[in-house]
A protein has these predicted regions:
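Small side chains
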Residues: 30, 499-500, 779
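Short beta-strand elements
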Residues: 772-788
Length: 806
């Protein structure tokens, strides 16, 4: 009889006091105390060096409990933002505590643009705001991994100071299509840039003793029906594009955790996809960390036992029924206890790294001033100058008063919606940003727009459009429709203002994709506003600047000819207005570059034909008798295959509004002395950058590689490396060194399930964008191959786009 059984028996005997002699009762109680003390002393307490001992001491029920989240408050339909209340109000979730073995609960908080927790708590006079850092698209546009790491460090510090252990980010899905509602959280259409920026972010966070959860693994390319849609993709496109960024991050930064996505990949849910979570992630890449589900609980068509077997270590947000299911599956033989033990070991290895395990004394008082400075710097370096006809920068106090048009000049969008939104202590809008730079703005326009915004907020609350109210009001800032401004009003502003700014805002986020007519394109009121303001101010010889305050790409080709300058400010965090003013006044020279192609029209992307919103749901279902699977909703075919973003536009010679890697500066740069050296598998590219202009600035050198014709069709060229100079003074030069491995140039050979770099002459193109190549050097490479798991093949035929279909 074990100690637990002995204690249970003695406790039972002690309850039947009517039949036990008093002396016997005292003896039994003493024995109970002795056995309790013995049992407690025999139980191991978790340490970093006794994980196997603790695992052996755990009961099956405790093991199952540790694999299931803390069952926090969340909407029963799943697929929403979590709502932890017990430890850190507003955090997304927790892991289970097992006190007898010294296993603490850990706290998971949403991100990745800052710590997402409730700013107000019942019974507390303190506020718990968090710094709103620039969104992913803005951060990546810096192309500055050192700066991104600093942002990560600040986020890691706030994560710890608010008693959290893991921030649920970075978001690493590709910008397959500009209509995806969650693109603002993600970095790029290119996997190399995605992986490098993510690795820097992860290094920064984890250097502070907090963890990350790189998400959403994998092929989460749309928000529409994201919890069920089947993303059908070739093995090659999956390996080269949708998985490659994760692979880079895993190999270079070793994230504590990875979050499996809601969607299916080739017919199997990612959360229960052994091909993804074990064969590729662990066997091919060597990942040793913990994998968690996205927030959904029990779902139809996927058992918790199958998730455990596939390699999912933590089911979030957690439901008691999932614990019971794991226990039952082990007992009835449908789940191997070895799978459970393997996952529990990974959970324990994660827990011993956390601030909660180390009893970190959280202050609830982050260094907001220091983090605001980092936010301002990273936003300023991530804002892209798209056009400049000599209107910027404003010099010598030439601009004293500005007419600010557009409702988002006054209701500035610092970030997106959903789990990616943050509750900051403040947001610097355009009015405040200009004021801090010593520039006045129109009081008349301020009164018009602030009164309109107050009205629009009341109207929005009254109407409560179901999808948008949930998305915006509960989990982010609403974007209100633009209003018309009369020509009389505009002409009155011309009389008193030295320049005009028109801010065009767009909001998007979790759970909803964007439409073309009103969210990608400008609505008629916005088109008219830009045209009327430009005509009026230009007639008086005064400049007009357009500020794009959007997390995602918008249409520009139809109106970009009107303004004198265009700045893509993205959603740059709480310091946005200050960052924009720094650029307008020339305090900082723009150095950002686009991380995605800006097409002339949304339909120019080949993926748009297989993207939700391009299909009339009701007409399709009626024609098919409500029985057929709906393309773009029930499934999405990645027929464009490897031709995503610039890989398509450059290979097929399609016109674009702004190419990948594009961004202007107030100075000019010369590229010289290009060189490439091959030493075994290591390839080193050198380029010297000289500032040939009149002001200091930074430049980003991008290395694209064009492969020789071979057995595997490839895009015309692909980004394989990049580097950013320090700030160069006029006339100053810097030689950049960019290294890559021969494997980095490989394509995925599906027939042989291997990576292959074919032998031949490779062109290393060094440029300022994918369409502005400044120097080219060639090198001959020998063949390279690497076998990997033959998994993740599509179950349905895809109509793959090839060069022969140009």
């Amino acid at each position: 009889m074990n100690l637990f059984c002995s204690l249970t028996t003695i406790s039972y005997l002690c309850t039947i006091t009517n039949i036990i002699h008093p002396m016997t009762k005292k003896l039994l109680l003493g024995l109970t105390a002795l056995l309790t003390a013995t049992t407690m002393s025999a139980q191991p307490k978790l340490r970093a060096d006794n994980i196997d001992e603790v695992l052996k001491a755990m009961t099956l029920e405790e093991k199952a409990k540790l694999l299931v989240g803390g069952a926090n408050n969340f909407f029963s339909t799943g697929a929403v933002v979590g709502g932890e209340a017990k430890l850190v109000p507003g955090a997304a979730g927790t892991t289970a505590e097992i006190a007898r073995l010294g296993i603490p609960a850990t706290v998971l908080t949403d991100g990745p643009a800052g710590v997402r927790i409730d700013p107000i708590r019942k019974g507390s006079n303190q506020t718990y705001y968090a710094t709103a850092f620039p969104i992913g698209s803005c951060l990546a546009s810096t192309w500055n991994t050192d700066l991104v790491a600093k942002v990560g460090e600040a986020i890691g510090k706030e994560t710890k100071e608010y008693r959290c252990d893991v921030i649920l980010g970075p978001g690493m899905n590709l910008h397959r299509n500009p209509l995806c509602g969650r693109n603002f959280e993600y970095y790029s259409e290119d996997p190399l840039l995605t992986g490098k920026i993510a690795a820097a972010y992860i290094h920064g966070v984890q250097s502070q003793g907090a963890g990350v959860s790189a998400k959403h693994f994998a092929v989460n390319s749309q928000e529409t029906l994201r919890t069920s849609v089947d993303e059908r993709v070739s093995q090659r496109a999956a390996r080269e594009l949708y998985l490659r960024g994760f692979e880079i991050a895993v190999r270079e930064s070793n994230p504590w955790t990875i979050m499996a996505s809601y969607n299916q990949v080739n017919g199997t849910y990612s959360m229960g996809n052994h091909d993804l979570l074990t064969s590729i992630l662990r066997d091919d890449w060597g990942y040793k960390g913990m994998v968690m589900t996205d927030w959904i609980g029990i779902r139809e068509g996927l058992t918790t036992a199958s998730e455990v077997h596939a390699g999912n270590d933590l089911m979030e947000p957690g439901q008691p029924a999932q614990v019971n299911e794991i226990v039952a599956a082990v007992k009835n033989g449908t789940l191997d206890i070895a799978d459970v033990d393997r996952n529990v070991r990974r959970m324990l290895e994660y827990i011993v790294k956390t601030p909660s395990f180390h009893k970190y004394p959280a202050s609830n008082k982050p260094d907001f001033a220091a983090h605001a400075a980092i936010t301002r710097q990273s936003a300023t370096e991530g804002i892209v100058l798209l056009k400049n006809n000599g209107a910027l920068p404003w010099k010598d106090n030439s601009i004293k008063t500005v007419a600010l048009f557009g409702e988002n000049s006054y209701d500035f969008l610092s970030g997106g919606t959903g789990s990616g939104c943050v509750h900051p202590p403040y947001v610097v809008d355009m009015v405040k940003g200009l004021q801090n730079a010593g520039i006045n703005s129109s009081k008349t326009l301020s009164e018009i727009y602030t009164k309109y915004i107050d009205f629009a907020k009341v109207k929005f609350q009254a109407e409560r459009h179901p999808a948008k109210w949930y998305q915006m009001e509960m989990f982010g800032q609403q974007k209100y429709p633009e209003i018309g401004i009369s020509p009389i009003c505009i002409n009155n502003e011309v009389k008193t203002a030295d320049a005009a700014i028109v801010t065009i805002g767009r909001q998007a986020g979790e759970g909803v994709d964007r439409d073309i007519a009103t969210e990608f394109n400008l609505i008629p009121e916005e088109q008219a506003l830009i045209k009327d303001v430009c005509n009026a101010f230009h007639a008086a010889g005064k400049p007009v600047i357009v500020i794009i305050n959007s997390g995602s790409v918008i249409e520009t080709a139809s109106w970009s000819g009107y303004p004198d300058a265009i700045l893509c400010a993205w959603q740059p965090g709480e310091e946005g207005g200050n960052s924009i003013a720094d650029l307008l006044t020339g305090k900082v020279n723009p150095s950002a570059k686009l991380t995605m192609t800006w097409p002339i029209a949304a339909t120019d992307h080949p993926s748009t034909q297989n993207f939700p919103g391009n299909i009339d749901f009701y007409s399709f279902q009626e024609a098919k008798g409500n029985k057929a699977a709906l393309p773009g909703y029930d499934y999405t075919n990645h027929d464009e295959d490897i031709y995503v973003g610039y890989r398509y536009f450059d290979s097929f010679n399609k016109n674009v509004a702004y190419p990948f890697g594009y961004g202007l500066s107030y100075t000019t740069f010369e590229y010289s002395k290009p060189a490439v050296k091959v030493n075994g598998d290591l390839i080193t590219v050198n380029i010297t950058i000289k500032n040939t202009g009149k002001v200091a600035g930074k430049e980003i050198a991008q290395v694209y590689v064009a492969a020789p014709a071979g057995n595997i069709e490839k895009p015309s060229h692909e980004l394989k490396g990049f580097a950013k100079t320090r700030e160069l003074k006029p006339g100053e030069s810097e030689t950049l060194t960019i290294q890559m491995q021969k494997r980095d140039l490989a394509s995925f050979d599906e027939a042989n399930s291997q990576w292959m770099t074919e032998a031949g002459q490779y062109a290393f193109q060094i440029g300022a964008s994918s369409r502005d190549i400044r120097a080219t050097v060639n090198a001959k490479l020998t063949e390279y191959t690497e076998k990997v798991s033959n998994v993740l093949a599509p179950k349905h035929k895809l109509n793959i786009l090839t060069a022969s279909k140009k």
